[in-house]
């Protein structure tokens, strides 16, 4: 969604300030290529980070486990966890 909004905004700016249709096409093409290259670079950085984490002999196992936990999949279980925690208390 972010990329689509950015492309539409760039297209609007290009249409506003362009001298001809060819300028608009070239501007949009350049921005799309730039966005694609940025996304690929970010993905490559993420893959490099994961590789370093797995191959790092100094990394502790628990630290890696905690890093890999994502909050969003755990959200539905939070009320159950709280209820189970409060059940033992009186």
Curated annotation (Swiss-Prot):
Keywords: Amidation, Antibiotic, Antimicrobial, Immunity, Innate immunity, Membrane, Secreted, Signal, Target cell membrane, Target membrane. Residues 21-59 form a propeptide. Expressed in entodermal epithelium along the body column. It is found in: Secreted; Target cell membrane. It comes from the Eukaryota. Disulfide bonds: none annotated. Its main location: secreted. Belongs to the arminin family. Antimicrobial peptide with a broad-spectrum antimicrobial activity. Keeps its antibacterial activity under a wide range of salt concentrations that mimic physiological conditions of human blood, which is surprising, since Hydra is an obligate freshwater animal with nearly no salt tolerance. Does not affect red blood cells. This is Arminin 45266. It comes from Hydra vulgaris.
